[in-house]
Amino acid sequence: MQLRAFISVFASLACVNAAVIDHDQVVPFAQPTPTTTLQTLAVQYKPQIYIANGCHPYPAVDEDGNTSGGLKPTGSQSAGCKGSGYGSQIYGRAVAYEGVYAFMYSWYMPKDETLPGLGHRHDWEACVVWLDSLENPNVVALSASYHSTYLTYYPPDSDYLDGNSAKIEYSTSWVILDHLLSATSTSGETQDLIMWDQLTDAARTALEDTDFGDANVPFKDANFETKLANAYYT
């Protein structure tokens, strides 16, 4: 059996043994040492997130492919999801796109609740930091997920950046009755970054295959290109 086929079979078997577990029992990946230029820049340009209301970010998957069961939208917006004792996670994926470089960062929240009982289990949000080069990079634009589309900031206001780190806010939109991301001048917190190509095979397979209901994983293979097209700033 060829190595690639063996790895694929092994990942599939691992996923069979994976489970949906309580949202506060998912152990995040530690941020690994970068080994590529894209990974290095992804760490250098990692954004921060300010939670205006709602859940704080949680890890969605562990190294064995176990995924978060999320939370029902009950109680207050942040009931049961004010932070994991194991620590949180930010996910990333980077690619050359339309002559620039797209660095997508994504957070998972166990629920998206605008009012008590109104909302849905699971929430995935993403922002894209657009760099003009890999050698002497500058942030040329920011994009922040707004339901199924993106708010774009081209060029971004200097108040939206803390050095290389974009400042992103997670808050409620009373127009679409969902949470969204937007650029902000308010500083936030950072989480350990794990890139798509740094995940275990079991974790990648779980993110590809798990049904997160009304939320979808923006950086998985099935969604990544479409999300980037929606987020592109011109």
Curated annotation (Swiss-Prot):
Report any Pfam family annotated for this entry.
Answer: NPP1
Q: Which UniProt keywords apply?
A: Glycoprotein, Secreted, Signal, Virulence
Localization terms from the record: Secreted
Say yes or no: keyword GTP-binding present.
no
Q: Does the keyword Secreted apply?
A: yes
- Residue numbers of motif Conserved undecapeptide motif I? 102-112
Q: Where is this motif: Hepta-peptide GHRHDWE motif II?
A: 119-125
Q: Glycosylation annotated at which residues?
A: 66
Q: Name one GO cellular component term.
A: extracellular region
Which region is the signal sequence?
A: 1-18
Q: Which cysteines are joined by disulfide bonds?
A: none
Q: What induces it?
A: Expression reached the highest levels at 3 days after inoculation of pepper leaves, followed by a gradual decline.
What InterPro entries does the annotation carry? NPP1
Instruction: Cite the domain annotation text.
Output: Key residues/motif important for the effector activities are degenerated in most NLPs, including the nlp24 peptide consisting of the conserved region I (11-aa immunogenic part) and conserved region II (the heptapeptide GHRHDWE motif) that is important for phytotoxic activity.
Function in brief:
Secreted effector that contributes to virulence during infection by P.capsici. Induces distinct chlorosis at 3 days after inoculation of host C.annuum leaves, and all the chlorotic areas gradually turn brown and become moderately necrotic at 7 days after inoculation. Leads only to chlorotic areas, without necrosis at 7 days after non-host N.benthamiana leaves infection. Induces cell death in hot pepper.
Name the family.
Belongs to the Necrosis inducing protein (NPP1) family.
What is the official name of this protein in its record?
NLP effector protein 1
